[in-house]
């Protein structure tokens, strides 16, 4: 399936890209080759292939959330240049 020059120009316009005439010609050839290559997938027999979302059948591997002891607050704030009421104090960025 060949991609036309006008299709490349249309996609470039949608993407707000400006190409020279030489670049449009080059992309027309390249995109046609890519589409032809991808169309080869239609030749595959997938009749007995089960649809998958992942190659490996892995499910949620996250650990359970558990509250664990943390570092001492004073130790954490020891090197903070600015602190207030046991918290880091940072410059205001939103009015």
From Swiss-Prot:
It comes from the Bacteria. The keyword Cytoplasm does not apply. InterPro entries: Asp/Glu-ADT_sf_sub_c, GatC. GO terms for molecular function: asparaginyl-tRNA synthase (glutamine-hydrolyzing) activity; ATP binding; glutaminyl-tRNA synthase (glutamine-hydrolyzing) activity. It catalyses: L-glutamyl-tRNA(Gln) + L-glutamine + ATP + H2O = L-glutaminyl-tRNA(Gln) + L-glutamate + ADP + phosphate + H(+); L-aspartyl-tRNA(Asn) + L-glutamine + ATP + H2O = L-asparaginyl-tRNA(Asn) + L-glutamate + ADP + phosphate + 2 H(+). Allows the formation of correctly charged Asn-tRNA(Asn) or Gln-tRNA(Gln) through the transamidation of misacylated Asp-tRNA(Asn) or Glu-tRNA(Gln) in organisms which lack either or both of asparaginyl-tRNA or glutaminyl-tRNA synthetases. The reaction takes place in the presence of glutamine and ATP through an activated phospho-Asp-tRNA(Asn) or phospho-Glu-tRNA(Gln). Belongs to the GatC family. This is Aspartyl/glutamyl-tRNA(Asn/Gln) amidotransferase subunit C. It comes from Thermoanaerobacter pseudethanolicus (strain ATCC 33223 / 39E). The lineage of its organism: Bacteria, Bacillati, Bacillota, Clostridia, Thermoanaerobacterales.
């Amino acid at each position: 399936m060949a991609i036309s020059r006008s299709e490349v120009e249309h996609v470039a316009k949608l993407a707000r890209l400006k190409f020279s005439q030489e670049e449009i010609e080059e992309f027309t050839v390249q995109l046609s080759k890519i589409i032809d290559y991808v169309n080869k997938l239609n030749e595959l027999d997938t009749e007995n292939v089960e649809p998958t979302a992942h190659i490996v059948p892995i499910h949620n591997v996250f650990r359970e959330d558990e509250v664990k002891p943390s570092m001492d607050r004073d130790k954490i704030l020891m090197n903070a240049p600015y602190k207030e009421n046991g918290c880091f104090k940072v410059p205001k960025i939103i009015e």
